């Protein structure tokens, strides 16, 4: 996950990170490697500034996780989700039962408590939240909120006494000597639109397609990302088949992160009407590549229009999104070059925010202090 990779890149000189994760990507069955530290006695694999243990599904049992956590010395447990069964629910339960070391815990819910996220499979989530509250599993943990909005979401569920630290997600570390991606010129009367994300209800691809259904201008949409929910993807495909002839749609599948910047550069607009993002690294990646964005107002990126980098609109106003699309279609090459420069300038401001790094460092220090 990009968020965790960026965190380790920034803080890897201050902390020794050991990562436990699945041995395959979302929607894939082939493992990254064979038997890397998953069985007894292994030392994991060195990846950047961390050691990573890649576990196959058969090793994500309570017993194996217990053995692994007891064998790996650690001073703090960082959980990158609240609703993940193997990497949150099982670990919190093991800790509550005293089966693994009771070290301090930081839990980053990654937007899982937003109204949009909780509305997906709500019964299961409500039942689990009730069980967690009754058990006291989260009573002594430190919560990471990526924004003040997420802090409110956490406190709405766990109360004002919950220990919540606002530490925004860290951007990618700047890489030296990276060449600028090749760009395609924007001509008036055309628009190359990109959707790049996991294909799931939370990301709202169906909402995007329905907005395009009301357009009369020529638009080309490329969809990139792994299919997380097959039934949802079939729903999207049905909408695609009903789109007017002026809207051309192609699904390009999942994509390696190393070519993402080039993909953004080949498009005129990143269209991402998500139901909620606690940060939205993909939005920053788009801006960094000089691709303006058209997104929902359910992310921290609220100052796009005032910085000339794009738009953020409420999802209940589809006509706002459609008007922005029409404005983009009408723009010519020179106007769009300026648009791209403003997007990159806004990205540079976000990347230079030292407060974000200090907030993350302080969060770890506070959690460790609470555990003494």
Task: Report the location of each language-model feature.
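A conserved mid-protein helix/loop that constitutes part of the nucleotide-sugar donor-binding site
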Residues: 2, 191, 195-214, 231-234
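N-terminal subdomain of nucleotide-sugar transferases
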Residues: 1-36, 372
């Amino acid at each position: 996950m990009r968020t965790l990779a960026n965190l380790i890149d920034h803080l890897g000189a201050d902390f020794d990170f050991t990562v436990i994760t699945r041995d395959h990507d979302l929607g894939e069955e082939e493992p990254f490697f064979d038997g890397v530290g998953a069985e007894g006695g292994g030392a994991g694999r060195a990846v950047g500034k961390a050691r990573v243990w890649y576990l196959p599904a058969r090793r994500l049992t309570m017993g194996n996780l217990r053995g692994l956590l007891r064998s790996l010395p650690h001073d703090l447990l960082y959980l990158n989700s609240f609703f993940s069964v193997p990497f949150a629910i099982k670990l919190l339960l093991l800790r509550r039962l005293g089966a693994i070391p009771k070290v301090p815990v930081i839990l980053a819910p990654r937007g899982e408590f937003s109204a949009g996220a909780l509305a997906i499979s709500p019964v299961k989530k409500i039942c689990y939240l009730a069980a967690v509250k009754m058990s006291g599993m989260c009573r002594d943990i430190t919560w990471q909120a990526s924004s003040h909005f997420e802090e409110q979401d956490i406190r709405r569920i766990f109360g004002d006494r919950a220990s919540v630290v606002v530490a925004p997600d860290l951007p990618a570390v700047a890489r030296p000597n990276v060449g600028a991606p090749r760009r395609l010129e924007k001509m008036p009367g055309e628009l190359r639109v990109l959707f790049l994300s996991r294909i799931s209800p939370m990301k709202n691809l169906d909402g995007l397609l329905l907005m395009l259904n009301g357009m009369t201008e020529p638009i080309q949409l490329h969809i990139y990302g792994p299919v997380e929910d097959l039934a949802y993807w079939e729903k999207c495909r049905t909408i695609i088949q009903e789109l007017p002839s002026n809207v051309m749609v192609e699904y390009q599948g999942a994509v390696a992160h190393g070519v993402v910047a080039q993909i953004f550069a080949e498009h005129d607009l990143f269209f991402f009407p998500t139901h909620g993002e606690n940060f939205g690294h993909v939005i920053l990646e788009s801006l960094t590549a000089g691709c303006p964005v058209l997104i929902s107002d359910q992310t921290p990126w609220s100052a796009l229009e005032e910085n000339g980098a794009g738009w953020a609109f409420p999802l209940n106003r589809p006509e706002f999104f459609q008007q922005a699309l029409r404005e983009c279609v009408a723009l010519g090459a020179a106007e769009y070059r300026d648009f791209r420069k403003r997007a990159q300038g806004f990205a540079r401001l976000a990347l230079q925010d030292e407060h974000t790094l200090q907030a993350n460092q302080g969060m770890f220090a506070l959690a460790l202090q609470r555990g003494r």
